[in-house]
Amino acid sequence: MNLSPYNDKKIKVILHDGSTFEGFATHNSFEYSYAEFGVDAECLQLGEYLIRDEEIESVELLESPASIRNTEEEMAMLFSVRRSFSEHLKRWEDNELPDKYDNNCFEYSAQPTQEEFERALNYQKERGDSFIKLEGDFPLADDFGLDSSVTLTMQLTGPTDRWIVNDEIEIREPGYKDIKEIELKHYGPLYGEDFAVRNINHLFEYLDFRGAYIGERLVGAYYFYSSDGYTCVDGLIVDEDFRCRHIATTLLKHAVSEASGDVVFLHADQDDYPRKIYEKLGFAEVDKLYEYLSTEK
């Protein structure tokens, strides 16, 4: 099978045993040296998975109309591979950052059975993970005793000309050292410095960042991903020592301007205060993600 046309494409690989893997692919052939992996033929690499041509039943290009959901899926696949797991569950897996809940979860298409949930729980335990996360487009009738939350997708629907901005601020691409410092200050106490550093390294490798500077000090930042006329703005953070100085709105206005006519959207916890701020700025709810999490060991 000629696998070269699938290089750097978003694909679904179906194996002879019926299992599936979805993500961005890299084509590797026998011309490369993969002896350490036992690979001596053409293969596709999706994340940490190397799939030889002899295992492959078929390959499908995941081509869908441009939309917010398609952009969200592409952004997720920068980090994780989605693979079949059970009748009602698919598994998102990021082996570079296996302890990040959002990148290593189970996506449900219908109410999972108790047997499916227990299998997923055992899978997590076998990996050495102390958490399990389920997510989907609708609330579960049986949440298996997990803590629930809802993340909103919010699309900008109004103008930005009345947004108050801070003229002291210069927006530019931040250096890694600056991003690491502000992320550690904000997230280190919440998640631990080790995880915070590994997470920012992961994000910095795959996404574009913009930072708000007052002088040479980074006082706020966000990252973004654009695809087919849609731009997702995420990871908005403001230095706690510089709150109430319109830094967030200055950053968001720059993001909208740089998007150059794209549909701009972001995410907010349904029950958190930032949602109200976004609504005042003209962002409106267009989608929901229902999430269920347990971090008990």
Region locations from a protein language model:
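Conserved RNA-binding domains used in RNP assembly and mRNA/RNA metabolism
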Residues: 1-67
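N-terminal charged segments
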Residues: 64-127, 192-193, 197
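A short beta-loop-alpha structural element at the N-terminal edge
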Residues: 67-72, 168-181
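Conserved acetyl-CoA binding element of GNAT-fold acetyltransferases
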Residues: 100-110, 229-240
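Acyl-donor-binding surface of acyltransferase catalytic domains
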Residues: 109-169, 174, 274, 292-294
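Conserved acetyl-CoA-binding loop-helix of GNAT-fold acetyltransferases
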Residues: 114-121, 238, 244-257, 276, ...
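Conserved active-site alpha-helix within GNAT-family acetyltransferase domains
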Residues: 138-148, 249, 270-288
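A conserved beta-strand-loop-helix scaffold within acyl/acetyltransferase catalytic domains
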Residues: 192-239
